[in-house]
Amino acid sequence: VIGGDECNINEHRFLALLYSERFQCGGTLINEEWVLTAAHCDMGNMYIYLGVHNVSVQYDDEQRRYPKKKYFCLSSRNYNQWDNDIMLIRLNRPVRNSAHIAPLSLPSGPPSVGSVCRVMGWGTITSPNETYPDVPHCANINILDYEVCRAAYAGLPATSRTLCAGILEGGKDSCRGDSGGPLICNGEIQGIVSWGGNICAQPREPGLYTKVFDYIDWIQSIIAGNTTVNCPP
C-alpha cells in the first residue's frame, strides 16, 4: 500500500497472508473456514497465515492453514483484468477466533461513489522500486466513478464487475503484493485488490477492485455446498 501508515494491530483480524516461496498476496477471512482472494493469486504450495501483524514475529495465536479446495468462476476458468478475478479458498481446517483473528462481513449492499474505504496489505510501500514492509499498511481511498478508470485504462469495457477506487490526485493506492486483499467500506468487504497502473498511486490512475457485492450469491452458494454454481454472467 502506497501512502498509507502501519495498520493498527487490532484492525485487521480478518486479513490473511497468502504465501508461497516466490509469491505473496492478501486475502480475507469471511468465516472460520473460508478465505476470499483474487484468482490471479492462485499459486502452488500456498500457505495461508492468519493472526499475523509483523511477518518476522511469531504470534501466540497465529494460525497457518493451506487450501483444501480452491473455487473459481465456472462460467470461465479464465479471468481477465476486469472479469472474475475472484477465488474462494476452503481451508484445510477451520480457524479459531482469537485476539487477532475474526472474520469480516460480506456486503449488505453495493458501495456508493464517494464512499471512503480502507485498503490494507503487506504489499510494496514504494513504486516503481519495491520496498516490502514487515507490517501491513493501511490507507483510506475513495470509491470513484467507473468512468475515471475507463479514461485511465484503454480496453476497459463500458461496464464490468469491478470497482474503481483511489485518490484522483494520486499518492495513495494498493500496489504489488497487496493483490487479493480487501477494500473495506463501513466494516464490510466491498472490493478485492485486482490491478492498476504499472506505477502505483499515479494521479488519475486509480486501482481496480473485484466488486464483491456482484458475487454474493456465488460465494454463499459455494459455502452452502452448491459447488456447481456459475459466476454472474
UniProtKB/Swiss-Prot annotation:
Pfam annotation, one family: Trypsin
Main location: secreted
Gene Ontology biological-process entries: proteolysis
Protein origin, superkingdom: Eukaryota
Enzyme Commission number, as recorded: 3.4.21.-
Entry annotated with the keyword Aminoacyl-tRNA synthetase: no
pH-activity note: Optimum pH is from 5.5 to 8.5.
SUPFAM superfamilies, per the entry: Trypsin-like serine proteases
UniProt domain Peptidase S1: residue ranges: 1-224
Keyword Protease: yes
Entry GO CC: extracellular region; secretory granule
Active-site feature positions: H40, D85, S179
Motif interval(s): Cell attachment site: 176-178
Gene3D superfamilies associated with the record: Trypsin-like serine proteases
InterPro entries assigned: Peptidase_S1_PA, Peptidase_S1_PA_chymotrypsin, Peptidase_S1A, Trypsin_dom, TRYPSIN_HIS, TRYPSIN_SER
Molecular-function annotations in GO: serine-type endopeptidase activity; toxin activity
Job of this protein: Snake venom serine protease that has fibrinogenolytic activities. Preferentially cleaves the Bbeta-chain (FGB) and more slowly the Aa-chain (FGA) of fibrinogen, but does not affect the gamma-chain. Also has fibrinolytic activity. May play a role in antithrombotic reaction as well as thrombolytic reaction.
Other information: Is devoid of fibrinogen clotting and caseinolytic activities.
Subunit record text: Heterodimer of the brevinase A chain and the brevinase B chain.
Protein name as catalogued: Beta-fibrinogenase brevinase
Upper classification of the organism: Eukaryota, Metazoa, Chordata, Craniata, Vertebrata
